[in-house]
Amino acid sequence: MSWTVMPTFETHERAHEEFSWELPDEFNPAVDFLRKHDDTSRTALRYEDPDSGLETYSFDDLDERSDRLAAALADRGVEAGDRVGVVVPQKPQNPITHLANWKLGAVSVPLTVLFGRDALQYRLEDSDATAVVVDPSVREAIEEIRDDCPSLEIVIELGDADTVTGDADAFDELLAAAEPGIDVYDATPETPTAIMYTSGSTGPPKGVRHSHALWLGRAAAAYNYFDHGLEPGAATLWTPADWAWGAALGGTLFAAWHHGCTVVGWPRDGFDPEDAYALMERHDVTTAFMPPTALRLLMAVDDPEQAYDLSLETLASAGEPLTSEVVDWVEETFADVAINEFYGQTELNLVVGNSANWFETQPGSMGKPFPGYEVRVLDPETRTELPTGEVGELAVKPGDRRVFFDEYWKRPEKTAEKRTDDGWFLTDDLVYRDDDGYLWFVSRADDVILTSGYRVGPMEVEEAILHHPEAEQAGVVGVPDETRGEAIKAYVQPATDDYDSDRLRTEIRELVRDRLAEYEYPKHIAFVDELPTTSTGKIQRRSLRE
């Protein structure tokens, strides 16, 4: 039996008492995910290509391909510590690139294909990315921004010499020309692994730099919120969430491979619930991570358990609180399928959650602290611990500092603000703890919007809106939405009184989609004569919400 980070415990209480982070002295995630398993010829990835159909990849296949890509990157000058962007959807080339990076000692920068040119440029430029591997769907955006990213020397596009145009290298050609069998970088849990970008309310997105221990933290949490069912060769996992999102990349894909399980990859635009059910039926998916928005869409299909021959055992969800309506629907619709909500942050790993094997889940509750973490509810002003039932800021302390982030990239002052002097990490999330130890989410302490499982910083959306010449000022907030949890609403102060409101709404939405991401456009737009501001001219978003 291969080593895994989280042993099995009979009870939640015993796990908290006995578990400790016994991280190995040497650790390279590429080796852990691919080479440690008893049978590396077993299927690691089942990929449904929209054009060519089903492709299967064993752990050996992924090892050989990532070896070749690592050799090709090294041949082009990529070295340990260099940042390499990954702008690829749920395709094999996504994890192959991450694995190749770590074999070289390079640092991955996961980015979603949903990003527009401004969002991509900011992140590639801020991370000082030397190279980027991209899907053809973002070709135009990359071509537009390449000259504005001074450190970006290498662009590799998925495809072969017949399909890749411009100055980009063809992914398929590089792999065919390279030789496998490179010397894997001697890494430890402290070796830098990735820079992930998170949105904030008071500034541009921040790069969150993690070390390799990140993936062990994600794997431990996943073992618990997937109800200890990650058995090698038995469990098959799928998520509709983009593999650029931490809970999908680390908490599903790489967590599955740490445990020797199979993952389904399926790059699709949008989410169709009937297609999702059919996919889970075709691949005998046992375990799925579903953001709440996806679950609400699945509810629209009548009698799915009768219409589809499903193998589902466990559902997990995160990104926003689940309503009792969704939880009740799962319990009533699927026989013996557990649904476990969990909570985490890009910076802090996945730290709180439900596990039906251990304790009764409470609809809407974040759950209880996972083994390896202590939590407190603090007074936001005094930082003193609050009693049961009182709302305060959630603070978390890991049993091993390394499973949390190392720093905000290039922002030491922001890094210092995230942690107290005695080692507690602050979340900016307001919660309370009940008498039974369950934690309940109340709201963000800042203005970040939770929409369809994504965290959206209002400032970035406001700046995109202001690129429209007819927008004088803009304020962005989240408003309740039955499907998305929250929807983005923009209050726009037009530059003149002479404007066509329908046309301007359409143009603003298209502008934000193009510059940022599909999920960041304002669903609702209201035009106002004047926006509420502070004495220093800052938008008072709280007034807009009221």
Model-derived segments and spans:
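Conserved AMP-binding/adenylate-forming core of the ANL superfamily
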Residues: 41-99, 116-121, 170-173
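Structural core segment of the AMP-binding/adenylate-forming
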Residues: 75-76, 99, 103-173, 496, ...
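AMP-binding/adenylate-forming catalytic core of the ANL superfamily
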Residues: 115, 121-122, 130-135, 288, ...
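Conserved AMP-binding/adenylation subdomain of ANL enzymes
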Residues: 216-239, 243-286, 301, 370
